[in-house]
Amino acid sequence: MPTKARIRLWSSNIDSLNFVVNQIRNMAQKTGIQVSGPIPLPTTRMEVPVMRLPHGEGKKKWEHWEMKVHKRIIDIAADERVMRQLMRVRVPDDVYIEIELI
């Protein structure tokens, strides 16, 4: 039987991500479960250069748009009670969660 749950979280909004991470950590600490993390992973930076003029005539001026994706990993003991509470955590729309039993 798996003894740990690895929770991967990622979002482009770091405030929402930290809010969910704190909820999970506080929930695990209240139940007395061993928690390791949150472990910050490298931030992925995606940049898209877009030409300002749609028709391409004149000087070529570019706008640069970027999006940063922040990632965290939390390892907790996989107890049935904790996993049920984990499913009840309110998650904003811009935070994505993946749970893996290891």
From Swiss-Prot:
**Gene3D superfamilies the UniProt entry points to:** Ribosomal protein S10 domain
Q: Which SMART domains match?
A: Ribosomal_S10
* Recorded coiled-coil stretches: none
Show the Pfam families listed in the entry: Ribosomal_S10 (PF00338)
GO terms (molecular function) for this protein are:
structural constituent of ribosome; tRNA binding
Keywords attached to this Swiss-Prot or TrEMBL record, sorted alphabetically, are:
Ribonucleoprotein, Ribosomal protein
Subunit architecture: Part of the 30S ribosomal subunit.
Name the protein family: Belongs to the universal ribosomal protein uS10 family.
| NCBIfam families in UniProt | uS10_euk_arch
Q: Which PANTHER family match?
A: 30S RIBOSOMAL PROTEIN S10 FAMILY MEMBER
Q: What does this protein do?
A: Involved in the binding of tRNA to the ribosomes.
Entry protein name: Small ribosomal subunit protein uS10
